[in-house]
């Protein structure tokens, strides 16, 4: 099993090395196509690993929007749900996300943080700038892994 994982990691790193040498347009088109194909096959609700293991950075605009939605003051929201990390950013105090329901639905989906809205960042432009982030996300997000597999075909 470890050998297969090493081979897969090697192929992924080789692909990243190849993609770094390609034009931005080429890389963006490959990611866009693979992203669309993968998300026709995968539902994030089947996994929700990002909500269980990754803490998003929460912007001040997110804090205002979410606290208003759940009907508490900004100060109470910050006190009850957030902490300041080593980069001086607001992040969740606890994981899994306190807004993740048992069926993997998000109780604040309509107003979820912008970092959650954008995750896994595979359908934006300038994908060459995101490659190292994608490598870090592969262990957490099966969709990112499948996107790399599709691009590598």
Language-model region placement:
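Short loop/turn segments that flank or connect secondary-structure elements
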Residues: 1-153
């Amino acid at each position: 099993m470890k050998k297969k994982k090493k081979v897969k990691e090697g192929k992924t790193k080789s692909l990243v090395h190849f993609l770094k040498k390609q034009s931005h347009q080429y890389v963006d088109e490959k990611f866009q196509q693979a992203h669309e194909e993968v998300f026709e096959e995968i539902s994030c609700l089947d996994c929700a690993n990002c909500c269980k293991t990754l803490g998003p950075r929460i912007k001040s605009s997110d804090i205002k929007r979410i606290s208003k939605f759940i009907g508490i003051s900004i100060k109470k929201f910050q006190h009850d749900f957030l902490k300041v990390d080593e980069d001086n950013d607001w992040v969740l105090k606890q994981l899994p996300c306190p807004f993740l329901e048992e069926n993997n639905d998000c109780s604040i989906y309509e107003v979820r943080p912008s970092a959650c809205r954008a995750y896994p960042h595979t359908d934006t432009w300038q994908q060459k700038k995101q490659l190292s982030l994608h490598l870090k996300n592969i262990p957490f997000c099966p969709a990112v892994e499948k996107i790399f597999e599709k691009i590598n075909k």
